[in-house]
């Protein structure tokens, strides 16, 4: 789909996606952000510098951190910056999850609607995931706007990280302390 720049905040629902990116994308094309708003800003800078659509990944609870840069920077009414936002859908209605994710999951679609961010939902059982992703990328490119992909629990196949030392030089928790 022509996307070759990735930034975001890792999420348990996206761990297999993130592991694949970590192993298969150049370090300069994958930046783990401090928070989701920062990831939106990094992706915006990438687009402005290269005119290439980036992908931002996050857990749905992180969308709150991303609202300001999405509305004041990326929105079609402002600078019209296209990007794909891959969101791990924690707390999806009808899917067992931790209590802290229930409300965010319940309002996820309505929140994207309120923000006027078009979206598609994907899951491992669907036959047309590639079509949905193509539709999102085409819409982002055509309308020059953020478009979201909501990934349901279990969407991505298990991926074992091959190069465990390829961690963008991230310190372990113990090293940081």
Regions found by a protein language model. Give the residues of each.
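Thiamine diphosphate
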Residues: 1-117, 121-177
């Amino acid at each position: 789909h022509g996307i070759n720049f990735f930034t975001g905040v890792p999420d348990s629902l996206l761990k297999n996606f993130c592991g694949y990116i970590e192993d298969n994308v150049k370090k300069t094309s994958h930046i783990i952000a401090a928070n989701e708003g920062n990831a939106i800003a990094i992706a915006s800078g990438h687009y402005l510098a290269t005119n290439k659509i980036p992908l931002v990944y996050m857990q749905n609870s992180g969308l709150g951190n991303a609202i300001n840069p999405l509305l004041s920077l990326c929105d079609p009414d402002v600078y019209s910056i296209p990007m794909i936002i891959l969101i791990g859908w924690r707390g999806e209605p009808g899917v067992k999850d931790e209590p802290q994710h229930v409300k965010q999951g319940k309002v996820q679609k309505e929140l994207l609607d309120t923000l006027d961010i078009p979206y598609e939902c994907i899951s491992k059982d669907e036959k047309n995931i590639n079509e949905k992703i193509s539709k999102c990328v085409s819409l982002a490119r055509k309308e020059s706007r953020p478009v979201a992909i909501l990934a349901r629990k279990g969407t991505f196949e298990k991926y074992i990280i091959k190069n465990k030392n390829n961690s963008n030089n991230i310190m372990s928790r113990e090293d940081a302390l």
